Amino acid sequence: MNTDIYKRAGWIATTNIYEVNIRQYSNEGTFNAFAKALPRLKDMGVEVLWFMPIHPIGKINRKGTLGSYYSIMDFKAVNPELGTETDFKNLVKLAHDAGMKVIMDWVANHAAWDNVWTNNHPEYFVRDDNGNFMPPYNWTDVIQINHSNPAQQDAMIDAMKYWITNFDIDGFRADLAHLTPLDFWKKARTSIEPLKPDLFWLAESEEINYHEVFDASFTWEWMHSTENFYKGNIHLNSLYNVLAKYETAFPATAYRMYFTSNHDENTWNGTAIEKYGDMLKALTVFNCTWNGLPMIYSGEEIPNQKRLKFFDKDVIEWNDKYELHDFYKTLLALRKNNAALRTADPAVTTFHIITEGGKNIMAFLRKNDHDEVLVFLNLSKEKTGFIIKDQLINGTYTNVFTKANVGLVPDTFIEMQPWDYLLFERKL
């Protein structure tokens, strides 16, 4: 597998992602209403805004009152419920002025039954022997796109170019990327990249070979495994096995995106608090310090305790506290400013730290020649004590959250509260 076909934008290595659900973000559910949140998100340290699909939604076989964001009528239009094209263009500019990037959710595998192509280009879709459009799987509100049609591929790529040329977006999150052939994505990136070479390509997939095209991919196995761990279904060693698999099976240059929630998980499987309970903050520390890209879903900074409806209006229940705002701000600032947390950087090494006692202690060190980040996570409902038994830990470290300086050497005893986390950094 050749992962050197395309040049990855340098800014991605230290970035983070915030998934935006415009419909549920405010009572208005519009671009203009969301724009009011940009100063708060900038202060929190958010860098990439991933917008769920913003296109008009199909009416035929629609689910619920508003339909699925992923049932698209027109790939070159804006859903009027969210605002106008001018509104979106202004939002992109405001985000750019705030130092943020904007990526769009892109659905290349299926479209609405009343997609504009169905009238003039029915050959763009898979049909049965009687010429009827066919839904993929049991997704009754969408129909399957015919990936073997070169003209369809060209039309889809042209639509992607439209948003770069006219709105200056910064990349794509490919919905269910692996359901669309890799050859299409190669064709798309090869054709689109000259328009804006520093685009970000994110795949909703764990298919390893898709990293030939995509900069980053989802860590679904890790997400499900951590939930099973919290429920007591598996042991900590199983989590280490997933991380080892990621390290050996995926290219060293592959960026992996870690998350505790997204639009699907929140609606269908539960909020992050439901799934992870008291482990949530420790897991978030992991997501922001391990070798990967952290992603935050709309409302996690509250934290959101509501399962949002997928096909109907169901606004996030905001308050003025944003209890996790400063927590995320601290983590995202560390990730941005400490070079030991650069993703897939050959100058950075990750070490599992040897400890004695505390069977559910996860300890790791990330370092380069100048910086270190040291992480201890008590992934247990019990107060746990342990002893550092690793020669790599020897010096004065700064607690990232309290700013207190702490001397840590081999044989240092540490006691941690249930589901607690300790995060240190130091300059070498």
Which residues does each PLM region occupy?
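Carbohydrate-interacting/catalytic domains
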Residues: 1-50, 56, 89, 93-94, ...
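Active-site beta-loop-alpha junctions enriched in small/polar residues
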Residues: 23-25, 54, 107-109, 177-179, ...
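Soluble or luminal CAZymes and related metallo-dependent hydrolases
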Residues: 30-33, 83-87, 151-156, 180, ...
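Active-site clefts of carbohydrate-active enzymes
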Residues: 251-275
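Hydrophobic targeting/anchoring helices
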Residues: 281-289
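Hydrophobic faces of well-ordered beta-strands that scaffold small-molecule active sites
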Residues: 16-18, 49-51, 102-104, 172, ...
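Substrate-binding/active-site clefts of carbohydrate-active enzymes
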Residues: 3-17, 23-32, 38-47, 53-167, ...
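Active-site-proximal helices and loops of the catalytic beta/alpha 8
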Residues: 165, 175-256, 286, 303-334, ...
